[in-house]
Amino acid sequence: YAKASGDKVQVTRRELEYMLACETTGRERFVILGLLSQHFKTALWSNEKDERLTHVTHNGYADYYKQMPYIFHNAKINLNIALRAIQTGIPLRVLDIMGCGGFVLTSYREEIAEHFVNGEECVIYENLEDMYAKAKFYLEHEEERQRIAISGFEKVRRDFTFDNALRRILG
């Protein structure tokens, strides 16, 4: 992310913004995982292990094609904490989770709210307190959580096919 200029390193404004967004998102994810793991069984699939998250079960890398669909489908709650640098659009992870029939609790993005009914097809949180309250609620209400996961799966299967995407693009 840096451009070498002689013995100096120059970082563009855009590169700096991206690095800060990654750092901010990393800290946000750390706080969320720390909070949730103090109250609920919390598992993380990632190459990176943070030793400070002592109550989080670290499961290492999950293969996108072979393991992730199973994980997404069987997790009680799949968290999507979107990278702060991504300001618009529906994160692919949200569609992946819903396409596997998983329940997704996601940070707010305008396009998610435009395309999905909050509380019907997915659950969107606004801040840390809202995320915790919704995680607690849906862990205690399994039938409601499963109903939302099924509705989200049906929506993705119906509206987010390659054919539909091509029609919108070529429209």
Pin down the residues of each PLM region.
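Non-transmembrane alpha-helical segments in soluble domains
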Residues: L33-S37, P69, K136, F153, ...
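Conserved acidic donor-binding segment of nucleotide-sugar-dependent glycosyltransferases
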Residues: C122-L128, Y138-E142
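Short alpha-helical segment that forms part of, or immediately flanks, the ligand-binding pocket
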Residues: P69, L92-G99, A113
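Glycine-centered loop/turn motifs
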Residues: N118-G119
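Nucleotide-sugar donor-binding catalytic core of glycosyltransferases
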Residues: Y1-Q87, L105-I112
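Catalytic phosphate/metal-binding cores of nucleic-acid and nucleotide-processing enzymes, i.e., regions
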Residues: L128-M131, G152
